């Protein structure tokens, strides 16, 4: 019996779902011809929890603890966007001190998110050492978060019109010490990684996205800036008090996985610059706008009513969302995090649409991996930086 020496059939391989510490519960159905990728189909939804529907049955204050479960590695940003939307709807002013503290927390959260992108990304392409180094610095950031908010993750720190509590005594000095220490840490990463020939072999020229292509796909964040587009919502939308600090938008022209790595590494240095300026120039004054209590809708209690017995319990303020629609957005570590909010003269939102950066950025994955090698899939997927909590919502 004679037969062909080699078979020409295509092979279909399942990649994932992965462990949450790496790429989360993402499943890729990959069609291979030998080691060449012919097609790739991402399967989503394993972490879908109905976050948009839950929002329609909660007041904004009640919904705050839920939002930290979207991107659970950059929780300050999900809180920021959740309070920014009703602040814009109700034209609520945030005190200058609260705005400075918000910026400090947001930039610390950005660094923590980029660190936990860097470690698994390097582990994916075979470098185990940085995976352990990043936890050293990330732990210091979480210590700062714990001192200020009481929680290492899922902080529930932002409030409409300000923040939950002022910074504790000595926190500013500790944070300045961390900034000085972390700059040496970034230099160590760059010395260890950036010019490593094996690392460059794996990332240079892999997963190239052109500037026009990035815009057409709706990409944002480091994915967009690595393709030569200088677009950062902190500069574009002028939210919080970013205009008062001296910093630069980090970008690269090449559009490959190396460019995305360089953008994120540079962003961590810029975040430290912003934090140092905010800490040194932080003004005094209140940390929340007590005027927003006017927006409370508390009905008059009858003396013998059931609610009256629990009047000593501090009620959470409820805000009437005016009958209009609004799109609010912030520059999260992974890209543009937005909320489309429709009010209906009630305390619950009529519609609460989340625009997660990871979900939009992930769309381009099948196009990027076609005609690449199987081993390049993890490099490209890692360079996109997704968290399935916000992709699936």
Curated annotation (Swiss-Prot):
Its main location: plastid. One of its GO terms (biological process) is photosynthesis, light reaction. It is an enzyme of class 7 (translocase). One of its GO terms (molecular function) is quinone binding. GO terms for cellular component: chloroplast thylakoid membrane. It is found in: Plastid, Chloroplast thylakoid membrane. The keyword Membrane applies. Its EC number is 7.1.1.-. It catalyses: a plastoquinone + NADH + (n+1) H(+)(in) = a plastoquinol + NAD(+) + n H(+)(out); a plastoquinone + NADPH + (n+1) H(+)(in) = a plastoquinol + NADP(+) + n H(+)(out). SUPFAM superfamilies: HydB/Nqo4-like. It is a peripheral membrane protein. The keyword Lipid biosynthesis does not apply. Pfam families: Complex1_49kDa (PF00346). NCBIfam families: PRK06075.1, PRK07415.1. NDH is composed of at least 16 different subunits, 5 of which are encoded in the nucleus. Belongs to the complex I 49 kDa subunit family. This is NAD(P)H-quinone oxidoreductase subunit H, chloroplastic. It comes from Lactuca sativa (Garden lettuce). The gene is ndhH.
């Amino acid at each position: 019996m004679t037969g062909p020496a080699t078979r020409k059939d295509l092979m279909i391989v399942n990649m994932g779902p992965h462990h949450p510490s790496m790429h989360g519960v993402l499943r890729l159905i990959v069609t291979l011809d030998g080691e060449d990728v012919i097609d790739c189909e991402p399967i989503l939804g394993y972490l879908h929890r109905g976050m948009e529907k839950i929002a329609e049955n909660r007041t904004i204050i009640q919904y705050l603890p839920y939002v930290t479960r979207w991107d659970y590695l950059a929780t300050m940003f999900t809180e920021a966007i959740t309070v920014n939307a009703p602040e814009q709807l109700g034209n609520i002013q945030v005190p200058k001190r609260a705005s400075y503290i918000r910026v400090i927390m947001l930039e610390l959260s950005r660094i923590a998110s980029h660190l936990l992108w860097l470690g698994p990304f390097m582990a994916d392409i075979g470098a185990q050492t940085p995976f352990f180094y990043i936890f050293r610095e990330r732990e210091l950031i979480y210590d700062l978060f714990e001192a200020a908010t009481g929680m290492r993750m899922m902080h529930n720190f932002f409030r409409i019109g300000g923040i939950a509590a002022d910074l504790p005594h000595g926190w500013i000095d500790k944070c300045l010490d961390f900034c000085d220490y972390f700059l040496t840490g970034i230099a160590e990463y760059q010395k260890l990684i950036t010019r490593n020939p094996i690392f460059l072999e794996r990332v240079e020229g892999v997963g190239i996205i052109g500037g026009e292509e990035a815009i057409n796909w709706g990409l944002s964040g480091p994915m967009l800036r690595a393709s030569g587009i200088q677009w950062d919502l902190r500069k574009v939308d002028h939210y919080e008090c970013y205009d008062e600090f001296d910093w630069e938008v980090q970008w690269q022209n090449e559009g490959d996985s190396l460019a995305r790595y360089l953008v994120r590494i540079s962003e961590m240095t810029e975040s430290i610059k912003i934090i140092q300026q905010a800490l040194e120039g932080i003004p005094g004054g209140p940390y929340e706008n007590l005027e927003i209590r006017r927006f409370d809708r508390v009905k008059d209690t009858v003396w013998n009513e059931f609610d009256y017995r629990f009047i000593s319990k501090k009620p959470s303020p409820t805000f009437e969302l005016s009958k209009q629609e609004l799109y609010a957005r912030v520059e999260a570590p992974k890209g543009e995090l937005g909320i489309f909010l429709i009010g209906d003269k009630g305390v619950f939102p009529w519609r609460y649409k989340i625009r997660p950066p990871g979900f939009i950025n992930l769309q381009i994955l099948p196009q990027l991996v076609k005609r690449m090698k199987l081993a390049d899939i993890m490099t490209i997927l890692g360079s996109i930086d997704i968290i399935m909590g916000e992709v699936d919502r």
